[in-house]
Amino acid sequence: MKIIFIAIILFILACSSVEEVNPVENADSLPKSHVNNIDKNFTVDDFVDAGWKKSKEFITDAKNENGDLLTPEAKEIWYGFFKRKDIEIRFYENHSISSTFGKESAEKAISRAVNANAGGGIITSTNNRVSYQSYVVSGNTVILCQDLLPDCILLSEKLE
């Protein structure tokens, strides 16, 4: 009786139709950016109060191989963690600057991460290997996200 029961279970499992999902293919179709809090200005402490773990500050005057600033108009750049994910926050004077200069440098950062190596990693100014897949423009900041958007959107929504 046990053998028949096990055979039926195996038959049901073998015949069930489960669509295999390839996360790499599906990740390309997901949005890579989000904008919110357009009328607000935030500080590092606002992010810490929202649950972000501050780790270290990066320089704002880093340049690429052509001598162009990587993060033009950035006032501060901080690296830290939220929900065990790498999060970089770039601070600008206001939302207008974060949604132009900040957005442009964020787009370059996520495309650079994808093209950097097989794992998508880039090496930061402190020799950390970090891969950013998406970003949120929130008020006067740009939040670079290690993973896709949900955790970064959650962090930006916790800001007060």
Map each language-model feature to its residues.
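N-terminal "mature-domain start" segment
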Residues: 18-76, 149-160
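Acidic/histidine-rich, surface-exposed loop or edge segments in extracytoplasmic proteins
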Residues: 23-28, 83-85, 137
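A short, solvent-exposed beta-edge/loop patch
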Residues: 117-160
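C-terminal motif of bacterial Sec signal peptides marking the signal peptidase cleavage site
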Residues: 12-14
